[in-house]
């Protein structure tokens, strides 16, 4: 670490990663993790004790994608860059297919670091693929290694087995055996594991043989509270809104209204990737089996970004097809909206505020939820929530008091919770106010970044190489790579 502060390298390999206008929901790999690493990078780069933050991801020169993903280096902010390294060719591929190409990514990253002549103080891997990459680089350069799992293989395997999926099918489709093996290795060598919740430490990492070896630090992510401001700000006569915000709101209302016979009803809102674990079908079933709920409120499901369902990946295609079939089964025409796309930068904050202004509710019925960032976003705008009782939402509801936890497999419980909030002015007002106030108290990126910087400085002060010449790789492979590259 120089006198100017920390140089932090983060790694997040899968999905579509760029600094602005994130394509969240475009596919199963471009979700909350992508948003997390971008927001974290921005927040860390603003810290006084941080000199530079680089986020490493894959270089993608694919005609099906924006040219943004083919920029070798993208400057997001003065002290924050996205660095794209080519591995496994130039085409986009889902994360399960990346494993054979990770060593290529490591080798090319070593070359990049040596060409830059600037050794990182910290390497931080997000998800097991990037965790493996960061672990190898930590060994090579003798620097501390931080890991954030975002989701874990053993927990996923347990859920898939419960759903009836055969183990050999899991291995073929998800490379689950390789993922768990790498996760066990990461737990042996990580200097620090950053998690979002205490439940993650206790229940998810507790499933691993090496789960007690690392140091853990619970650092919940934050949200941009200026972007997700309360819904009533727009109702005030002195409110000054940008043309971009006004356009986003008008476009969303126009899109929603074309689906609804009675558009002025309260709005039940769901926003997620088209993934089976998100349990969209469970929410539609809860709504479809409750005629009184249909009379009270409309349902809008924003399930990622889609064009032609038949051309999508199998998991996404199955989820969206099931969604359409459920809509038809329960005859929800005129009551349910299923828009094909939405803009996360401008439209999503407006979407929460539209639902809040209609005194609606946001629902996250996921079967498994490592954290639940959308719950924070909704709560911050004053939109009450109904959330799965699995994982991160437990901490969020405990800290914020902005809604009700439910068993995501119980459609009756989901319907009851929605009904309780929408039908009671007292409940709605209580949950709305709690969310607005408590998100701002407990969940900001500034708090996260300050605590992160303190942990990073502690790790660095414990001893590391300070320049390229002083590097002492942790193993023979590292010594060879430093010499050859």
Label the predicted regions.
Residues 1-485:
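Catalytic cores of nucleotide-sugar-dependent glycosyltransferases that transfer UDP/GDP/TDP-activated
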């Amino acid at each position: 670490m120089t006198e100017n502060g920390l140089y932090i390298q983060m790694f997040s390999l899968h999905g579509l990663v760029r600094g602005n206008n994130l394509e969240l929901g475009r596919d199963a790999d471009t979700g909350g993790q992508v948003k997390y690493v971008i927001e974290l990078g921005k927040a860390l780069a603003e810290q006084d004790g941080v000199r530079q933050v680089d986020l490493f991801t894959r270089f993608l020169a694919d005609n099906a994608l924006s040219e943004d993903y083919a920029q070798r280096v993208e400057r997001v902010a003065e002290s924050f860059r996205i660095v794209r390294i080519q591995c496994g060719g130039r085409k986009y591929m889902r994360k399960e297919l990346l494993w054979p190409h990770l060593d290529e990514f490591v080798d090319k990253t070593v070359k990049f670091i040596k060409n830059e002549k600037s050794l990182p103080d910290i390497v931080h891997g997000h998800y097991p693929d990037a965790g493996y990459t960061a672990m190898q680089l930590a060994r090579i350069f003798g620097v501390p290694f931080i890991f954030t799992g975002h989701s874990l293989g053993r927990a996923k395997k347990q859920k898939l087995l419960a759903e009836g999926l055969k183990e050999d099918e899991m291995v073929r489709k998800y490379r689950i055996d390789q993922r768990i093996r790498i996760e066990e290795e990461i737990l042996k060598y990580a200097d620090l594991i950053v998690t979002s919740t205490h439940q993650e430490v206790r229940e998810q990492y507790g499933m691993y043989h090496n789960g007690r070896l690392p140091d853990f630090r619970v650092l919940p992510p934050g949200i941009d509270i200026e972007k997700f401001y309360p819904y009533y700000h727009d109702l005030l006569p002195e409110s000054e809104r940008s043309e971009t915000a006004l356009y986003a709101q008008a476009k969303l209302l126009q899109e929603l209204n074309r689906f609804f016979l009675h558009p002025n009803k309260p709005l039940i809102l769901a926003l997620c990737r088209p993934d089976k674990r998100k349990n969209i079908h469970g929410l539609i079933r809860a709504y479809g089996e409750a005629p009184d709920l249909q009379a009270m409120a409309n349902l809008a499901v924003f399930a990622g970004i889609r064009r032609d369902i038949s051309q999508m990946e199998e998991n996404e295609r199955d989820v969206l097809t099931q969604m359409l079939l459920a809509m038809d089964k329960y005859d929800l025409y005129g009551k349910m909206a299923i828009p094909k796309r939405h803009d996360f930068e401008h439209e999503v904050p407006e979407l929460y505020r539209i639902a809040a202004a209609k005194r609606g509710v946001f629902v996250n019925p996921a079967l498994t939820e490592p954290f639940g960032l959308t719950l924070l976003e909704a709560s911050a705008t004053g939109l009450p929530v109904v959330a799965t009782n699995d994982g991160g939402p437990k901490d969020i509801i405990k800290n914020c008091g902005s809604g009700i936890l439910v068993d995501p497999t119980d459609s009756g419980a989901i319907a009851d919770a929605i009904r309780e909030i929408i039908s009671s002015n007292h409940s709605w007002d209580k949950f709305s106010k709690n969310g607005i106030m408590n998100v701002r108290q407990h969940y900001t990126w500034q708090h996260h970044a300050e605590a992160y910087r303190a942990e990073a400085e502690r790790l660095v002060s414990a001893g590391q190489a300070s320049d390229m010449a002083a590097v002492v790789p942790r193993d023979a492979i590292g010594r060879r790579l430093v010499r050859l590259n």
